[in-house]
């Protein structure tokens, strides 16, 4: 099965359930050489995060290409996955300290993203910001929140829980429409919960391999587009209870 997001999803977040447990995946693809020559780091315990880094460590820092893609609170299992560094700290704290502030973190996250807007990497075709949250403590309102921010001030959001999703079902959101000459992702599919796929994966490694393997399109101009896939299942193993697996195009020792 090809990637359900098309030949070029850009950056793609999937969230759902595997073996009755919360699960996520983050897939990275790119067209330019600098976008392709990146990798996902192992889990970095000082940061409690996984970063997308350049292969060449002497390469100049680029905030649109080099960032924390996954962040986990080791105590609660709160997980954030995003293609953009800018909103991460504020949104992560909105969820982590919601009991202290007594404010709705879903609403606050939507406001933060709306105020920032899309990434400013391209004036004509800016890249959308996509973000997913898994809050294992929020069973009542639903453990998953997902966000798509294309143009200011309009953003799109969904929320759902483990009790409303079939096992093996993954909802996804992505930066682009799936075409190599990209446009915006169809937000109507997203908000109607129609951007979803079923997986046979049983483990995070299965999920990472499945998504990475299905994204094997080779473009005549840009070549191989897939870069990396990070996947996780909250089965009690790993940081915050998340067992993590990573599939990189390039091996980094």
Residue ranges and their predicted role:
Residues 1-253:
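Conserved short alpha-helical segments that host acidic/polar catalytic motifs at enzyme active sites
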